[in-house]
Amino acid sequence: MMKRILKWAALLLAALTLYSLFCALSIVRYAERDESAPADCIIVLGAGTDGKMPSPVFRERLHHAVTLYQEGYSDIILLTGGYSPGNEHSDAWIAGAYLQSLGIPEDAVLLEERSTITQENLRFAKEIMENENLSTCILVSDPLHMKRSMMMAKEYEIESFSSPTPTTRYQSWRTKLPFLARVTFFYVGYQVYKIFAKV
C-alpha cells in the first residue's frame, strides 16, 4: 500500500515538474509578444515604492507607459498599487507624482489605490474602467510577468493588449532565473487554484 502511494506521489511530482517547465517556456516565449494598439487606457501594474519614489522595476514600467502615451496609443494612464506598510501615500499616488515630474498632466492619470497583489491590481482597475466608461487597455508590466497578467486580465473580462517593457531590471540570467521561477510558481499556483475553486 505504501509503495503504491509513493509511486503515485512520484508520478504526480514528475508530472507537476514537467508541466512547470512547459509553463516556464511558455512564459519566456510570451514575453516577446508586443500587442500595443490604440486603447482607452494604459494600465501599469504596480511594483512597489520606497515611500517616496517608485522602485527601479516600477520606474521601467512607468517609462514605458509614458512612451506609449506620448506616441498616442492612449490619453489615460491608470496606475495601480495600494499602501505599503509605513507609507503615507499609496504606490499609485507616488507613481502619479513621478509621472507628473516627467511631464504627464495630472488629469491624464487615474489611480487605483487599494491593491497589494497583481490579481487585485486588475480587479480594482476593472472597477475604475467601468466607472470611467473605459473598455480597452494596454497592459504594461515586465516581459516575464506578462503571460500571467494577461491571463488574469482575461479572467476579469478586461480587453487587453500586452505591452511588455522594452527594458527591464532583470538583464542577466542570474537575475532572470529567480524571477522566472517565481513567476512560474505563481502562474501554476493560480491555475491550480482555479481548478479547485470550481470543485
What kind of feature is each model-predicted range?
Residues 10-14, 68, 189:
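Enrichment for repetitive, rod-forming helical segments
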Residues 173-199:
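A transmembrane-helix-recognition feature enriched in membrane-embedded lipid enzymes
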Residues 23-180:
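A structural signal for short, hydrophobic/glycine-enriched beta-strand patches
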Residues 2-34:
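N-terminal type II signal-anchor transmembrane helix
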